[in-house]
């Protein structure tokens, strides 16, 4: 049986709408689903709301949530059987499929329509994309949706990655905030709550939303 991997749990979240209101399921009868998410962020709020309001329990499901800390880590957990479902970008499924694997993960639903990262700098200034010319951005894992979306947005603003601006892909997803506050790079792209935590500490400022710049992907 093919392992099920997804960037979302929207398909499951729609079940209450399709099946009507649940009558409640005894805890002993719930089926545990091990869900590995790429990061714990308000970006995925619909999933947390569904869990908190008991929508999954109404359908006989108990969600066991784990923070994978990156799409590559999520995929490893799904492929190895440590998790049943992954919440991350679809790129990892494509990479596994392109390797010719018969038992490859599949995408079955969608929770978000754009990238959730924010571009952050060290100074609270009026931002212009030309400010990035000749600078270095910590952009995350090469080939990941956040990094690819960043490169797309840079090109849309006339900046060629690795020529006009360096996109550093050497830092793991869950280490990007620490690398930036530690002095690495001039800019960084971060999801919430890491972005707000950096702002609160006075070590960086949100300049723009990458998702707002790229649009739906």
What positions do the PLM features span?
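Short, well-ordered beta-strand elements
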Residues: 28-41, 61-67, 134-138, 166-168
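Pocket-lining segment of extracytoplasmic ligand-binding domains
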Residues: 92, 172-217
């Amino acid at each position: 049986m093919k392992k099920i991997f997804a960037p979302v749990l929207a398909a499951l979240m729609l079940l209450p709408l399709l099946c009507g209101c649940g009558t409640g399921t005894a805890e002993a009868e719930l089926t545990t689903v091990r869900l590995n998410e790429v990061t714990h962020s308000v970006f995925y709020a619909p999933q947390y709301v569904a869990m908190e309001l008991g929508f999954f329990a109404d359908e006989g499901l108990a969600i066991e949530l784990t923070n994978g800390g990156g799409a590559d880590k999520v995929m490893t957990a799904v492929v190895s059987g440590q998790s049943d479902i992954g919440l991350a970008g679809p790129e990892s499924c494509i990479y596994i499929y392109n390797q010719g694997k018969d038992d490859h993960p599949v995408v079955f639903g969608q929770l978000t329509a754009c990238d959730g990262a924010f571009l952050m700098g060290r100074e609270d200034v009026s931002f212009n994309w030309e400010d990035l010319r000749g600078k270095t951005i910590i952009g995350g894992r090469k080939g990941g949706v956040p990094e690819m979306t960043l490169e797309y947005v840079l090109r849309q603003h006339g900046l060629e990655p690795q020529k006009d601006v360096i996109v550093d892909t050497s830092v793991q997803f869950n280490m990007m905030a620490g690398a930036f506050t530690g002095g690495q790079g001039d800019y960084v792209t971060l999801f919430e709550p890491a972005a707000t935590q950096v702002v609160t500490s006075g070590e960086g400022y949100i300049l723009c939303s990458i998702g707002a710049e790229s649009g739906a992907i």
